[in-house]
Amino acid sequence: MDSRTGELITARQAENGVFIWEIENPLYFKINQVEDMQYTRTRIYSVQIRFNHNLRRALDLHKAYLNFQVWTTSMTASGSNYLARFRQLVLLYLDRLGVISINNVIRSVRFATDRSYVNYVLENHSIKYKFY
């Protein structure tokens, strides 16, 4: 859903993509928070993926933040280690695919979190399209 207008994103907008070799560093990865749940073996990583300026311009986006909460049982990985592994798997999937779009980035996150130590993945996105 477009967070500015409240309209649903069409399939055409979600699948609209750009070749990965046309844009340098298309995605920014940021870890917002790492939580250890008390009395459990659960660690929660809050990861944000942002589209860079050139990718947003190619896809006619004003803003694109994809926020994920990854609930894991992996207690050994620190936030920076997990982010590096997560980033590597997302970019590996996109490199193999060759096209970056909103749906392909979400599919790549599904690929990166399809591990035995991941219990849940919660998504919250902030996407705004250009009007003009």
From Swiss-Prot:
One of its GO terms (biological process) is viral process. Keywords: Host-virus interaction. It comes from the Viruses. Increases viral DNA accumulation. Enhances infectivity and symptom expression. Belongs to the geminiviridae replication enhancer protein family. Homooligomer. Interacts with the replication-associated protein (REP). Interacts with host proliferating cell nuclear antigen (PCNA). Interacts with host retinoblastoma-related protein 1 (RBR1), and may thereby deregulate the host cell cycle. Oligomerization and interaction with PCNA are necessary for optimal replication enhancement. This is Replication enhancer protein. It comes from Potato yellow mosaic virus (isolate Venezuela) (PYMV).
